[in-house]
A protein has these predicted regions:
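N-terminal, post-signal peptide beta-strand-biased segments of exported outer-membrane/organellar beta-barrel
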Residues: 15-125, 469, 495
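Hydrophobic, lipid-facing positions within transmembrane beta-strands of outer-membrane proteins
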Residues: 49, 61, 96-100, 170-174, ...
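Residue-level signature of outer-membrane beta-barrel architecture
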Residues: 55, 103-106, 178, 338, ...
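Membrane-embedded beta-strand positions of outer-membrane beta-barrel proteins
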Residues: 63-67, 113, 176, 188, ...
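Extracellular loop and loop/strand-boundary signature of outer-membrane beta-barrel proteins
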Residues: 83-88, 158-162, 321-327, 373-379, ...
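Outer-membrane beta-barrel "beta-signal"
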Residues: 521-538
């Protein structure tokens, strides 16, 4: 049963990233939501996407506050045959996903600050658990089929499972940009990443249907079946002891029929001993040929087996008792960042940025650990991979511009640990993203934009599990930029992400199950609004 909650130990793989790499959120502004290509930005969100590009802004002090509302639906369909329901759905909801930027630009230098959820930022809730939580419980039905010999027919199960996780890795970034000349500008800075993951969940009220009625599984196995098996073991031990006088008297080589014929045991005693042997699985033919010494050995072996089964039922019953988890993990890391902005010709701007790997360890603060899986104070590595980004923006005319962006996450440089099935989470290729966007001014103060983003995750079959899975995706964004006055900018945007279905094949150790497949699906929907103000604009 420990396996049922082992998934929660992989906190860094909770999977509430909405746009970006395996852990990194790329959706850092409303401008991004409506255009999806921002790596050559020269306005407010350049603080995150292209900090060297801040040198293209006019002098003054700038402040922008953006927020997004994000929804993600995860659907898992399992082919495991013993589950009561093959479909599991989880909802990830982020009502407020805030980001903010502040810039002070003066001639050849600019200082900037930014904040936002660098990873995570939401909560996911599985009201009916996950297949990996329930498989062990559903296996009780075939696993207890042998109890039919005790006239205890187990035909179904039910349980209450719930799991909720929240993850937020904040990013608080600061740095300085410097204009070398009209063509080149550079940036140096860092991002402080305080991280928190919170996990709560329970598995309770596990019941099995026995002879048509549901019973508490822990009580049934521990208080009914285990004592019954123990009683049968005691009877076997007594039967073995009852034939010892015959063996001591030299009749150990006789069969029960011969001992009865010789008057050493009565017909009733013979019938009782033979009935006990039949109960242990010995055939009538074997009993007829079995000497009394073997009868005694069979009863002793049967007693040992029954005692072992009783102990197993007691242990299994204890594992099926209600279990809860309430764990919080915290930690922090630093991300060094450098950037370059290049303007080779008028109208063309190129931005480049490199974020170094962030070393980050999370420490358990455990309130409830009914599984023994989350020792208080234990540490877990949750490094963030390095990121290289480059983009270009071309202004066709004062009313129209196009942009293209590329991101590459060095996922191979991070140890991703193992998934809940014990498989190493390996990377076949580093995650990369390619996006294009366009913006056109319709009338003075109003522009419309659209964007497209393709993400290739580069994960292997072993990487995914029902707890955390990734697949290639296509994202579409659109929105508006509104300027009611020269120093105020309002951004409105929405995006929709479609993920390719991911399949994971399993080979169960139970021959009756054999091979089966789980399908993983999800989709995102997001809305954003942003307000930017330039103090001192003319």
């Amino acid at each position: 049963m420990k396996k049922l909650f082992a998934t929660a130990g992989m906190l860094m793989f909770f999977g509430v990233v909405f746009a970006g790499g395996l852990l990194t959120n790329g959706n850092q502004s409303a401008q991004y939501i409506r255009m999806l290509s921002r790596n050559a930005s020269t306005t407010y969100d350049a603080v995150y996407f292209n900090p060297a590009g801040l040198m293209k802004m006019d002098n003054g002090f700038y402040v922008a506050i953006h927020s997004q509302t994000l929804f993600q639906t995860k659907t898992i369909t399992s082919g495991y045959p013993y589950l009561n329901d093959s479909k599991y759905e989880g909802e990830v909801t982020v009502p407020v996903f805030p980001t903010g930027f502040a810039i002070y630009k003066l001639d050849k230098v600019a200082f900037s600050l930014g904040f936002g959820p660098n990873s995570g930022g939401g909560s996911a809730e599985y009201g009916e658990g996950l297949p990996s939580f329930e498989k062990t419980i559903s296996g009780l039905v075939p696993g207890l089929a042998g109890l039919a010999k005790l006239n205890q027919n187990v035909t179904n199960y039910k349980t209450a499972i719930s799991f909720k996780g929240e993850s937020i890795f904040w990013g608080i970034q600061g740095g300085a940009s410097y204009k070398i000349n009209d063509m080149f500008a550079v940036y140096g800075g860092a991002r402080y990443v305080p991280a928190t993951n919170t996990y709560t969940g329970y598995i309770k009220n596990i019941e099995v249907k026995v002879n048509g009625a549901f019973k508490n599984a822990a009580t049934f196995l521990g208080n009914e079946i285990a004592p019954a098996l123990k009683g049968m073991a005691n009877q076997s031990t007594a039967a073995a002891s009852s034939v010892q006088p015959l063996i001591s008297g030299g009749a150990g080589g006789l069969t029960l029929a011969q001992a009865n014929g010789a008057g050493l045991i009565t017909a009733a005693q013979r019938a009782q001993l033979e009935g006990g042997l039949l109960g242990l699985g010995v055939t009538s033919a074997q009993i007829s040929a079995m000497p009394i010494t073997t009868v005694q050995g069979t009863y002793n072996a049967g007693a040992a087996t029954l005692n072992g089964q009783a102990a197993q039922m007691t242990a299994t019953g204890a594992q099926l008792a209600d279990k809860s988890v309430d764990v919080k993990q915290t930690g922090s890391g630093i991300t060094p960042i450098i950037g370059v902005n290049i303007t080779p010709v008028e109208g063309l701007n190129i931005g480049m940025k490199y974020e170094f790997k962030t070393t980050l360890k999370l420490t358990n603060a455990t309130t409830i650990d009914g599984t023994g899986m989350f020792p208080d104070g234990a540490e877990t590595s949750s490094d963030l991979p390095a990121l290289f980004s480059v983009g270009a923006d071309y202004k066709v005319n004062p009313d129209m511009n196009f942009s293209i962006s590329y991101n590459n996450y060095n996922d191979k440089g991070v140890d991703w640990g193992k998934n809940i099935y014990g498989e190493p989470r390996t990377i076949s290729d580093n995650c990369w993203e390619l996006s294009v966007g366009a913006q056109r001014t319709i009338v003075k103060g109003l522009a419309v934009s659209v964007g497209y983003l393709h993400t290739d995750m580069g994960v292997t079959h072993e990487f995914n599990s029902d707890f955390s899975y990734y697949s290639n995706s296509n994202t579409f964004g659109a929105g508006f930029e509104i300027k009611p006055m020269a120093n105020l900018t309002i951004d409105l945007g929405m995006l929709l992400t479609n993920y390719a279905s991911a399949a994971k094949s399993f080979k169960d150790t139970n021959p009756a199950v054999g091979n089966y497949v789980e399908m993983y699906d999800k989709h995102n929907l997001g809305f954003a609004i942003g307000l930017g103000y330039h103090f001192g604009a003319k």
